[in-house]
């Protein structure tokens, strides 16, 4: 293996330590593989390589000196547009499949099945029923669950093009629903939206880049619908998150425990594993693990159990291979999405078991344990016992757990934020937030979303941008691997607020934190959950917009994805634009091969839907542009 300089791979000290260990042991990681891919294809990076039919692949010369059309006659604008919207559709399919899984579980529960699950948050269930117009008076709980499941599954089944998805219609501001409805951007059916996107991008179909991009925005709104229903139903099923103190980074692993990582996105299994682990503690101790069982999280599954159970977060997407390198990981249990196929190859060098659980997501070299919700506890016990058995194969001489970890205050659901505000004003909880936006103590709000990528130093842009905006009194929210970056860097603490927040923001967070009984300020970055939980920020923003009597596109609210990587992130960014948010991406999407498409998403979209993309790889200038967008919105509100 070629020597690799690990110093600039990640801003996370734990990651650097483990990468040096990988280097010393000739173990290949994502950073090594990225280096071997250089130089990456310029045609693909610009979106100018088309592989849609077997006459290709066709490449368009970005400089205009070579081919201008594919064999079928598609020009650069069509090629770029249809590949972009296909990526958005794939992201939508991933998030909505997650949501479908939860909705089907709710349906089974309403029918008296799935005895290992129950409705843990009845108050949230009744709140959802009110939102969706389901009668509750004098009705049994399971009947209400059944109606909610039916309405939700209807968003995957409805064939009436004039009837928008129920969750979107009920959850957005009336002005946004009307605006998007008039533009034809409200999907009627999640599955149909994905299917239609694939159909219209088949060879010989839609060749109008503007029409294609509008179709992309429509399917992105289906992604928001799928995320909304996944988040809300998960809260009813597993509990709505409330603030909890946890910890983050590889130092959360324990030498004297059976360490089990849950990695992926769906809480159906990981939540049960957290419940069952306590029951098998004595078995772990009997096997020699004096500290019992230690569950740790990776990626969005990690955030699901972190905010509901206080489970510590080991790391985010790009460094998911590194917990194996500690020599102290007994098992990594994975379900769906963002799971590296390299994991079993690295695990072969250690005692770690990589356990896949979803029949649609298997990995060569991993051990597959099929997960059946009807036997959830039994499956969880099987997996945990596999990890306990692996503990006996651990080589103590190879254990190298980094000492570094950070305290993290997490679990700020929309309900938790409102509850904290209610400590200041019980009669009108949103008033303190509105008042402080109006008086300028809070200039605006930024939502950090998205992934990690090897194209930049891991986590660095997140941290730099958040500090820059917080200093200018911008309230910072985060989900997914963005939240993981902040947790690992210690920005989800009261101490970070004291150190980095501007005076206005610091005063607000201190007042609310003290009133809420935290004994100090709210954390600098507020953890809202996993990637589907971006819908929590939308719920909070919608409540704020409705209170002010404005649309979402009027609010001083922006989004940022400094390390945008996955197709899901493109879907998230696209619906953020569609609901009216200026949205920054720090990885250049494959659109620069088309001036028309680039202008559509960065300029024309602003006139059409209110939101637009800001593409900037430099955190400093990106922060300036986001802050300028916030100031433009404030001016529009007369602030």
From Swiss-Prot:
GO biological process per UniProt: generation of precursor metabolites and energy; response to hydrogen peroxide
One of the record's GO molecular function terms: protein homodimerization activity
Protein location: Cytoplasm; Cell inner membrane
Chief place of localization: cytoplasm
Swiss-Prot/TrEMBL induction comment: By carbon monoxide; under anaerobic conditions.
Positions bound to [4Fe-4S] cluster 1: 41, 49
Documented EC number(s): 1.2.7.4
Catalytic activity: CO + 2 oxidized [2Fe-2S]-[ferredoxin] + H2O = 2 reduced [2Fe-2S]-[ferredoxin] + CO2 + 2 H(+)
Consequence when changing residue 531 to A: Displays hydrogenase activity
Binding site for [4Fe-4S] cluster 2: 50, 53, 58, 72
Binding site for [Ni-4Fe-4S] cluster: 265, 300, 338, 451, 481, 531
Cofactor section: [4Fe-4S] cluster; [Ni-4Fe-4S] cluster
InterPro entries: CO_DH_a-bundle, CODH, HCP/CODH, Prismane-like_a/b-sand, Prismane-like_sf
Note accompanying the cofactor annotation: Binds 3 [4Fe-4S] clusters per homodimer. Binds 2 [Ni-4Fe-4S] clusters per homodimer.
UniProt topology in membrane: Peripheral membrane protein
Function: Allows growth in a CO-dependent manner in the dark. CODH oxidizes carbon monoxide coupled, via CooF, to the reduction of a hydrogen cation by a hydrogenase (possibly CooH).
Other notes: Methyl viologen can act as acceptor. Inactivated by O(2).
Family: Belongs to the Ni-containing carbon monoxide dehydrogenase family.
PANTHER family (alphabetical): CARBON MONOXIDE DEHYDROGENASE, HYDROXYLAMINE REDUCTASE
This protein's domain notes: Cluster B is an all-cysteinyl-liganded 4Fe-4S cluster; cluster C is a mixed Ni-Fe-S cluster which is the active site of CO oxidation. Cluster D is also an all-cysteinyl-liganded 4Fe-4S cluster that bridges the two subunits of the CODH dimer.
Assembly mode: Homodimer.
Record's protein name: Carbon monoxide dehydrogenase
Native organism taxonomy: Bacteria, Pseudomonadati, Pseudomonadota, Alphaproteobacteria, Rhodospirillales
Gene that this sequence comes from: cooS
